[in-house]
Amino acid sequence: AEVWLESAAGAAVSLDGRPYEGRLRVIQQADGLLVVNHLPLEAYVASVVGAEMPSSWDREALKAQAVAARSYALAHMARPASRHWHLGDTTRWQAYRGLSSLSARTRQAARATDGLILSYQGGIVESLYAANSQISWEAHGQLGASMSQQGAQALAARGLRYGQILARYYPGASLARLRQGKA
């Protein structure tokens, strides 16, 4: 059995005191309840940026994080983690905290890079990243390219733009824009 929770127009849906954008799908399973947040991709990206990086960081680092988060999410939408959801909300995937990690700066980073992803040879890059270069290497070294979030901040502080930052961490990848289809 399942239930969908929706709020009144423009309001948030809350669960355990945490507000979420979009709708919540509550699914009864043998071991308890599974709650899945369904929301627009760009709202998800803005929340991930704020959960993964301090919103006070340089705007270019936040934009690089937005592109990496969007690319990672889309790579996983192509091969979902389960039949009920694409990504978890922990750092195993990408940290996601609903509306609690949003700020004007994280929304602006998502908006400024709206629809931009990392692409390599026509595919979407599973843009791995971690807090710093040591963690990035330990967690993803054998997999290839991975962004250090602290490194991205340092590069942004030196004046590099988000595209230049991403090029440092994902060699050979290029920025591509998603086609927005009309339904």
Language model: regions and residue ranges:
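Conserved, single-site charged/polar hotspot
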Residues: 1-183
